[in-house]
């Protein structure tokens, strides 16, 4: 990969992945240090520990809950930005827009779920927290499959297979983790369920980090223009639009 030919926007998905994963592990270590949860490598519950090391339990009590809320809010914002930029990136390249629109909607709903589970702690409002968890995991998984399909279909810079196959594999692993997580939860095997949950979240974050592959080819700009009180005619509008129409935003 030639760094001189890479857009700075490639770092956005990487920052999202690294920031969120680091923040969640900080929450985990704070909760373990305060003896709120068991360490992930514990074989059995020890005296004084309250819960299995689920992420929701790790971020349930201050000071860990304060960090958890901030991490999830920032993650939701970055995920929303990634969703919009990815939609714009693929918009001129797909013939049938429904799949691209579905990918945008799914990731937006997953981002909204992140804010719910981050700001409504489990013991304070379990119902809303669980709704946020369902939105995040459910629409997050759907997003992964949609983006994997779009990657193979659009084939940006002939890198569709190189980026798409790992995404299909990650999507399958994520789906398997979601199913396994709920099975273990139903059987009250909480230590293993918590480990699966952490693995699931790390796979999610790794998946979105792979979007840097396509983002490195694109440059995004925000264009600000002065409001014109007198509207241009239709022909003038088309003429002006043709001057600025590019594949870049």
From Swiss-Prot:
Its name, as the record gives it, is Transmembrane protein 150C
Describe its function.
Nonselective cationic channel with high permeability to Ca(2+). Component of a mechanosensitive cation channel. Confers mechanically activated (MA) currents with slow inactivation kinetics. May contribute to proprioception.
Q: Disrupted gene: resulting phenotype?
A: Deficient mice exhibit loss of coordinated movements and abnormal gait.
Query: A GO biological process this protein is involved in?
Result: cellular response to mechanical stimulus
Q: Which residues lie on this side of the membrane: Extracellular?
A: 31-64, 119-130, 190-192
Q: Which Pfam families match?
A: Frag1
Question: Family per UniProt?
Answer: Belongs to the DRAM/TMEM150 family.
Q: Which reaction does it catalyse?
A: Ca(2+)(in) = Ca(2+)(out); Na(+)(in) = Na(+)(out); K(+)(in) = K(+)(out); Mg(2+)(in) = Mg(2+)(out)
What stretches pass through the bilayer?
Answer: 10-30, 65-85, 98-118, 131-151, 169-189, 193-213
Name the InterPro entries for this protein.
DRAM/TMEM150_Autophagy_Mod, Frag1/DRAM/Sfk1
Q: What is the lineage of its organism?
A: Eukaryota, Metazoa, Chordata, Craniata, Vertebrata
Provide the topology term for how it sits in the membrane.
Multi-pass membrane protein
**What domain of life does the native source organism fall in?**
Eukaryota
Keyword Ion transport recorded: no
The molecular function terms in GO held by this entry are: mechanosensitive monoatomic cation channel activity
Native organism: Mus musculus
Q: Which UniProt keywords apply?
A: Cell membrane, Lysosome, Membrane, Transmembrane, Transmembrane helix
Q: Report, as the record phrases it, the tissue specificity of this protein.
A: High expression in the epididymis, pancreas, dorsal-root ganglion, eye, brain, and spinal cord. Expressed in muscle spindle afferents (at protein level).
As a miscellaneous remark, the entry gives: Tentonin comes from the Greek 'tentono' meaning to stretch.
């Amino acid at each position: 990969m030639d760094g001189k030919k890479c857009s700075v926007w490639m770092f956005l998905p990487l920052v999202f992945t690294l920031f969120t994963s680091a923040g969640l592990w900080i929450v985990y270590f704070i909760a373990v240090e305060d003896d709120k949860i068991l360490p992930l490598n514990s074989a059995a519950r020890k005296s004084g520990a309250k819960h299995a090391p689920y992420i929701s339990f790790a971020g349930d009590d201050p000071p860990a809950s304060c960090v958890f809320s901030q991490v999830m809010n920032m993650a939701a914002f970055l995920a929303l930005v990634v969703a919009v930029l990815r939609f714009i990136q693929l918009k001129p390249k797909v013939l049938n827009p429904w799949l691209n629109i579905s990918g945008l909607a799914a990731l937006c709903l997953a981002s909204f779920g992140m804010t719910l589970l981050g700001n409504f702690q489990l013991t304070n409002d379990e119902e809303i927290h669980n709704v946020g968890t369902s939105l995040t995991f459910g629409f997050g998984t759907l997003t992964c499959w949609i983006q994997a399909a779009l990657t193979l279909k659009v084939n940006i810079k002939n890198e569709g297979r190189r980026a798409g196959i790992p995404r299909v594999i990650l999507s399958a692993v994520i789906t398997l983790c979601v199913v396994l997580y709920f099975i273990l939860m139903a059987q009250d095997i909480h230590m293993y369920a918590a480990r699966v949950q952490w693995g699931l979240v790390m796979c999610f974050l790794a998946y979105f980090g792979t979007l840097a592959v396509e983002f490195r080819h694109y440059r995004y700009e925000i264009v600000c223009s002065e409001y014109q009180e007198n509207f241009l005619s239709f022909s003038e509008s088309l003429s002006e639009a043709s001057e600025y129409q590019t594949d870049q935003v």
